[in-house]
């Protein structure tokens, strides 16, 4: 059949020996040692620029790297009156809360003034044009756009031409649908600018098992792109785990109060929770160091906690050392106890004592005859 497709046709395998490229997003580096933390404001400003500025400032003060918005053109995005949300008709909600291009421009300027990157999600190709005209530094798409390949084709063309990163959420879709989207970016020469975020499009997920954090590594290895986590859980545990598993971006909805009216407020982090998220992630990043060495603080413990070779009874000068007259004991200030094991025993066992050794003496190498 013309529409049939081999399950693995679009799958792209990543060479694990190849170093992952980092991407520049304004002053930020995506894919580097520091996780990029996105405060997803979305439409939680309720159509107010002043409220939006309060949100951006609060996100900045909490330590977020990015303030993310959404740009809606409802008449182009959707058919009116067809989608009912828990807060009313979606079309009407979008019309009521949307920002004009001038208002987005004002928010971009404000973000720049206070030192936080501006990011925005377009929901149709026309909105992509608006954002490109505004001079955005990157794009972010929602999970609902994953099968809108013309939308992604346009973003991919822009990305290939400009080098701008495109962050794509992967909630509520199949692996094959993700592969199709990746293929679009590959065909347009923009795959190296693509970031995929693992996501569950539940608000919030009703079980932690739905987070599917194991997909973080699978997305990276199958598609060879930088991977993040768009997290809709009500707390920070999933995000912490995602960072430990290699997520380079964490996105969480953000509000000044969960008590506000609107579709996203109740699942969003409040300022104190966002600060906890940032602080926790920064600590985890440090804890993920992979250089094995003995710290100064560890050495203090090592000195007493490790074991030395100790004489069981009195040993006379010239007497042969054996496992019958030596034993491992703390502290670790003498000959290491490993020299009593067969791996190293030939360097000590069978040698002669260089002096008389009282019982319970911690041996040093000076006590071993040359």
Task: Please give the residue ranges for each predicted region.
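Catalytic cores and adjacent flexible loops of soluble metabolic enzymes
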Residues: 5-370
């Amino acid at each position: 059949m013309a529409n049939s497709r081999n399950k693995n046709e679009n799958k792209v395998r990543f060479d694990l020996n190849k170093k992952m490229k980092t991407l520049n997003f304004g002053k930020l580096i995506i894919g580097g040692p520091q996780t990029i933390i996105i405060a997803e404001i979305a439409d939680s400003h309720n159509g107010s620029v002043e409220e939006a500025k309060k949100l951006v400032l609060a996100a900045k003060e909490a330590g977020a790297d990015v303030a993310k918005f959404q740009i809606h053109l409802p008449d182009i995005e959707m058919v009116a009156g067809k989608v009912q949300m828990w807060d009313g008709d979606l079309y009407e909600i979008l019309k009521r809360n949307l920002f004009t291009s001038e208002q987005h421009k004002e928010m971009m300027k404000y973000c720049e003034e206070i030192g936080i990157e501006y990011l925005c999600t377009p929901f149709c190709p026309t909105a992509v044009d608006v954002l490109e005209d505004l001079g955005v530094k990157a794009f972010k798409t929602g999970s609902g756009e994953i099968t809108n390949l013309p939308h992604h084709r346009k973003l991919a063309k822009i990305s290939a031409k400009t080098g701008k990163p495109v962050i794509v959420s992967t909630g509520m879709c199949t692996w094959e649908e993700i592969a199709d989207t990746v293929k679009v970016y590959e065909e347009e020469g923009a795959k190296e600018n693509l970031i995929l975020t693992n996501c569950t499009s539940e608000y919030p997920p009703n079980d932690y098992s739905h987070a599917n954090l194991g997909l973080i590594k699978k997305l990276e290895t199958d598609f060879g792109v930088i991977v993040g986590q768009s997290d809709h859980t009500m707390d920070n545990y999933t995000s912490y785990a995602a960072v430990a598993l290699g997520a380079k971006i964490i996105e969480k909805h953000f509000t000044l109060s969960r008590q506000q009216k609107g579709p996203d407020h109740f699942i969003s982090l409040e300022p104190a929770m966002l600060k906890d998220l940032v602080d926790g992630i920064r600590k985890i990043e440090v804890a993920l160091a992979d250089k094995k060495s003995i710290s100064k603080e560890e050495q203090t413990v090592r000195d007493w906690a490790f074991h030395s070779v100790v004489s069981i009874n009195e040993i006379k000068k010239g007497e042969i050392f054996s496992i019958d007259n030596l034993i491992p004991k703390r502290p670790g200030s003498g000959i290491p106890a490993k020299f009593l094991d067969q791996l190293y025993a030939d360097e000590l066992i069978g040698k002669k004592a260089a002096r008389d050794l009282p019982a319970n003496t911690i041996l040093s190498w000076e006590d071993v005859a040359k």
